A protein has these predicted regions:
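N-terminal anchoring/stem segment of glycosyltransferases
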Residues: 1-31, 46
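Conserved donor-nucleotide/metal-binding helix-loop-beta segment in metal-dependent transferases, i.e.
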Residues: 64-94
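Short, flexible, basic/aromatic active-site loop/helix in glycosyltransferases
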Residues: 99-112
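PAPS-dependent sulfotransferase catalytic core
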Residues: 158-206, 210-211
Length: 246
């Protein structure tokens, strides 16, 4: 997995610092009191590029990145301003094969998790527009999906085709599933000379990566039904019409 990274890397974190030979890393520190989405918005505004590849901290790359495919996606976005994102992970739901971009399918406007935090190439301005302050990652995916439907139905959200090699290869859903380590993570960390991890604190997810990636649609965790009053309130907050109560 050699070859380095041709891009600048921005690490959005609270107080850690890091450097690595051969990599252009800029650490953006934030207060622990800041909400997750506030930190992400602030970090994105400090990045000067037109596009960003968003990756969460448990997306541990386990094979060579297909750089030529990323370059191709950038070219497509340059030529097509209606494209908001190319997600490098496939969805678990039915998508639209519009045959516009090889290896990608269109997420339906009403699709579950149309907005999500899987590894993806984003048009930075569009990503910032969808985000709102005061949200956790899970709230961001839920509310961001709603905002993408209502405010940005004219924008195209693409995901990788199912059953094709990932452009940025990592375990489906990341190294942590529902707060627990995946079974394959220790071996991957050992291969990369990372050994000081106490796996007993989190424990291990009983589901394998293969099980997660083959879940039937009715088994995928979705937002539970709530009263209409609560639901309307959440959506008004998502759109920024009212403020959430502390």
């Amino acid at each position: 997995m050699g070859g380095g990274c041709p891009y600048s890397i921005y690490l959005n974190t609270e107080e850690k610092n890091i450097s690595f030979n051969g990599l252009d890393i800029e650490v953006i520190n934030h207060s622990k009191n800041m909400k997750w989405s506030d930190r992400l918005i602030d970090s994105l505004k400090k990045i000067k590029t037109k596009y960003v590849i968003l990756m969460l901290d448990d997306f541990l790359i386990n094979a060579d990145v297909k750089q030529d495919k990323i370059d191709q996606c950038i070219n497509w976005m340059d030529q097509n301003p209606d494209v908001a994102v190319f997600s490098f992970a496939s969805s678990l739901w039915k998508d639209i094969d519009d045959k516009r971009y090889e290896g990608f399918v269109l997420r339906p406007t009403e699709g579950e998790y149309r907005f999500n935090l899987q590894a993806a190439l984003w048009r930075k301005k569009q990503l910032i527009k969808i985000l709102r302050k005061g949200e956790s990652p899970w709230q961001t995916e839920h509310m961001g999906t709603f905002r993408s439907r209502v405010l940005y139905s004219n924008k195209k959200f693409y995901a990788s085709e199912k059953n094709v090699p990932m452009i940025i290869p990592y375990e489906f859903g990341g190294a942590i599933h529902q707060g627990k380590w995946t079974e394959g993570t220790p071996e991957l960390l050992r291969k990369n000379n990372i050994s000081m991890v106490d796996y007993s604190i989190r424990g291990f997810d009983p589901k394998s990566t293969e099980e997660w990636s083959k879940l039937r649609l009715d088994e995928v965790p979705v937002i539970k039904k709530k009263s209409i009053k609560i639901k309307i309130g959440e959506y008004l907050v998502a759109l920024g019409i009212i403020k959430a109560r502390n």
